[in-house]
């Protein structure tokens, strides 16, 4: 059996490892990057840490795993009738296909986002921003989007300015009525307090109408800023949106059945799946484990139990020694939250990357 897996994030790597360990046949992992980016240390390069510390090559992860081909390529089409996926130059036949491409930025149709904002999705983005800020530390900064990415990055930026003995002028903007809208109201309240304690201004119920090179046009005014960071809006990967005739789409996610199957012999896992656990690293790993086990059961003629994921663990750090973590109405915050989050990340990263690299990624300031 040949399983093709698209996506080199948590879900894709974990599914590959699980299937390879059970010797299910040939496995091809296709990723458009040779690296797995370690989000735990992503923003630490603001403090000047080497980018090498924050990424691990896929070839290193699978160096001692047999039966796995790692391919750096970009799949642009899927033909489920013929069980083939294609890149620009290569056709890959599959018996089982696992899609875990993650999500991509969405400018939400707002003029100027693409040309006048900076992204913070990968290491190169962060490094580029740091170098830009070093040229003029006095320029105002606006972060559009008060979800986990925007909140975390606001805290990291504030600490960086403090470390270089500068005063940051950071404004966090969101169209909603609270920060961290997918978390509990307690999380929003505590996170807002922490952000304000760090000197970060919060503008809520402010929808962005247009982005210019020197300011943001809102529904009720203008905010001047030359460094404008986009942390709002994401959508499905083109490999999904180009093939909606095969997939059901609900709330900007791919519909899957009780076994995470979106089409015959095609499974969708990770952030882009409409399933419990979507959007979290913990959920991505659990989905990957489930799909691998289900495929093995199918090979053996056994039935699988329907997919079910425990309530999500949600967490967000604000600075290097403060974090908020919640699950099922129970939460911790502050220094204890930071320690708890570190333990959770330690468990997750050690499931997919070698021990030495995991330690380096999880201790970016050491």
Regions found by a protein language model. Name each.
Residues 1-68, 152-182:
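Beta1-alpha1 glycine-rich phosphate/pyrophosphate-binding loop at the start
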Residues 68-142, 218, 229:
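FAD-binding core/adjacent interface of flavoenzyme oxidoreductases
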Residues 70-73, 77, 162-255:
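A Rossmann-like FAD-binding core segment of flavoenzymes
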Residues 113-198, 202-204:
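Predominantly flavin-linked oxidoreductase catalytic cores and closely associated redox partners
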Residues 114-137, 224-289, 293:
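FAD-site-proximal beta/loop scaffold in flavoenzymes
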Residues 162, 282-315:
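Internal hydrophobic alpha-helix adjacent to the cofactor/substrate pocket in enzyme cavities
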Residues 251-267, 304-307, 320-330, 337:
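FAD-binding beta-loop-beta segment adjacent to the flavin cofactor pocket
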Residues 320-366:
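C-terminal auxiliary extensions adjacent to catalytic cores
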């Amino acid at each position: 059996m040949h399983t093709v897996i698209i996506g080199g994030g948590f879900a894709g790597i974990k599914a590959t490892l699980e299937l390879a360990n059970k010797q299910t046949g040939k496995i091809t992992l296709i990723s458009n990057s040779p690296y797995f980016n370690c989000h735990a240390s992503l923003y630490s390069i603001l403090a000047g840490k080497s980018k090498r510390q924050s990424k691990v090559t896929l070839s290193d992860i699978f160096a001692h795993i047999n039966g796995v081909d790692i391919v750096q390529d970009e799949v642009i089409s899927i033909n489920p009738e013929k069980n083939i996926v294609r890149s620009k130059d290569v056709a890959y036949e599959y018996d089982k296909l696992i899609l875990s491409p993650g999500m991509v930025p969405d400018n939400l149709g707002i003029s100027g986002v693409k040309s006048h904002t900076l992204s913070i999705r990968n290491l190169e983005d962060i490094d580029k921003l740091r170098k830009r800020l070093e040229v003029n530390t006095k320029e105002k900064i606006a972060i559009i989007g008060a979800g986990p990415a925007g909140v975390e990055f606001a805290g990291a930026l504030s600490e960086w300015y403090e470390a270089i003995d500068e005063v940051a002028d950071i404004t966090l903007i969101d169209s909603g009525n609270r920060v961290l809208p997918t978390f509990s109201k307690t999380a929003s309240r505590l996170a807002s307090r922490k952000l304000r304690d760090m000197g970060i201004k919060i503008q809520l119920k402010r929808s962005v109408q247009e982005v210019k090179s020197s300011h943001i046009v809102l529904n009720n005014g203008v905010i001047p800023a030359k460094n404008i960071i986009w942390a709002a809006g994401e959508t499905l990967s083109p490999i999904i949106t180009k093939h909606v005739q095969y997939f059901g789409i609900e709330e900007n996610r791919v519909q899957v059945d009780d076994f995470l199957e979106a089409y015959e012999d095609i499974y969708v896992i990770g952030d882009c799946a409409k399933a419990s656990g979507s959007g979290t690293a913990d959920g991505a790993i659990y989905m990957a484990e489930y799909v691998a086990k289900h495929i093995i059961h199918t090979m053996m003629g056994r039935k699988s139990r329907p997919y079910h994921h425990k309530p999500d663990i949600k967490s967000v750090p604000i600075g290097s020694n403060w974090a908020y973590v919640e699950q099922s109405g129970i939460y911790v915050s502050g220094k204890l939250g930071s320690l708890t989050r570190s333990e959770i990340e330690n468990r997750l990263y050690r499931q997919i990357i070698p021990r030495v690299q995991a330690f380096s990624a999880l201790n970016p300031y050491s």
